[in-house]
Amino acid sequence: MPGTVLLLAASPVGKGCLVDAASVLPVLAAVPPAVLAGTDTANVVELADPLEPQAVLTRLRAAAAAPGPLTVFVTGQLQLDRKQRLPHLALARTTPSTVRYTGFPWHWFREELRLRSAGTTTLLLDLHVDAATWAWLRGRGLECGPGVAVYGRVAPPVGRRKVAAPTYMKAVDDRVAERRAAGAGAVASAGAGPDRGRGRGGGPGAVGWRCGRRWWPRCGFRPRGPFPPCPRGPRHQPSGSS
């Protein structure tokens, strides 16, 4: 059965940018789709610096509804909206004062992926955060949905007016290249990505690990720290509801 791959790289334009997210897309897009998906054939959807959260939701919803394995690569930065203090993936037009309206609410990932069969969905995340979001994540968490295998890292701020590189995703590409050279196959089925802690994709202060049966069962994605239950966010509007 064909697989589906969603490549999403987003970061704000201007001084609010924390990571050069879009720079990783040419690297990942050069990998054969079947290798990214871990299937014989695959369809790839690429979103580079999208402007509208609804456009991202439409693509994510279509990918989640597709049969077969789904692999989602997300590179970018998280910010909290000022009213509800919930994490959003910052898009091209996101500013600190407009996060709630121009960012992509993280809980939409969870809501769109929650109905997929366990073991058919993989997320690879390379996320950067500001100081406020880092503190929020340490006390809560970043849920991605039940039955979703999560690999990646959350990196703290790199300093004022500095733009970080998506080193985790570049490490994923290196791992894929190694496996292709060894004839081992695909990223989605191989447990790709650096090991837990400050591995090849980490960096100073970065927190990254592999989620799944071998590492952290269905945990979502969290930095180190106490893990009280994550409060529920605003209700997500499912497809077809009014």
Where are these regions (language model features)?
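Extended non-globular C-terminal regions
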Residues: 205-242
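Proline/glycine-rich low-complexity loops and linkers
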Residues: 112-135
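Boundary/activation segment at the start of structured domains
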Residues: 1-69, 228-231, 242
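A short, glycine/acidic-enriched catalytic loop
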Residues: 77-110
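Active-site-proximal C-terminal subdomain of hydrolase catalytic domains
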Residues: 128-215
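Short beta-strand segments
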Residues: 8-9, 72-77, 124-126
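Extracytoplasmic/secreted cell-surface and envelope-processing proteins
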Residues: 17, 81-83, 132-136
